[in-house]
Amino acid sequence: YPAGFFNAYREIALDEDIDLVLHLGDYLYEYGAGGYGTEDAKKLNRAVDPINEIVSLDDYRKRHALYKTDEDLQLLHSQKPMIPVWDDHEFANDSWKNGAENHSYDEGYFSTRKANALKAYYEWMPIRESNSKLKIWRKFEIGNLFQLFMLDTRSIYRDKQLNFDNYFKNGLFDKKQYIKDLQKKRNLVGTEQFKWLDKNINNKFKWSIIGQQILLSPTVLPKIFSELDKNSFP
């Protein structure tokens, strides 16, 4: 929102060939004025509300409400059904089950912040609240064409991610310690969610689609912007 406009949402809303929208998270960002992605907010007349980083329930509600004021986003929701799932920024940057990179002790218990984010999410997003608010994984069947599984890889079972900065000593990378830590029993989706997915995948569908928040494989992108003048682009 503060970093730019949602014209892509408008194009999706107006495309009659699109019947369903999947949103895989980072629907909003938690940063306050002066934080990540807000450099052009004043120039674009898209200041964040509240101006602080969102932590309380009222904060999260206001930020959701702010995003919903965008006319292109409103159009998208009015024209297309959306199946959403959260990523990290619906809570805080690089969140995991017991914390987040962008959460500090002076902001209170992360569990409280997480509960605030969850409540606001279910209030403002097109999704039914489950008996257990954290269990967002669910399955959709679209005729006999495809089955869609929406998973959680952020908030329920995810262990704290390794920080590469912790493995540099005297300018050298401690590969031995990194490999040792990497081989520990670490979790991402959890036993319960994995068993649910394994049990519910049905071969009668032509396609089985998994919607979740993180990359499953390395991504190679062309070095377009390093070769061209960045001032040539808006």
Regions found by a protein language model. Give the residues of each.
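Metal-dependent phosphoester/phosphodiester hydrolase catalytic core
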Residues: 1-234
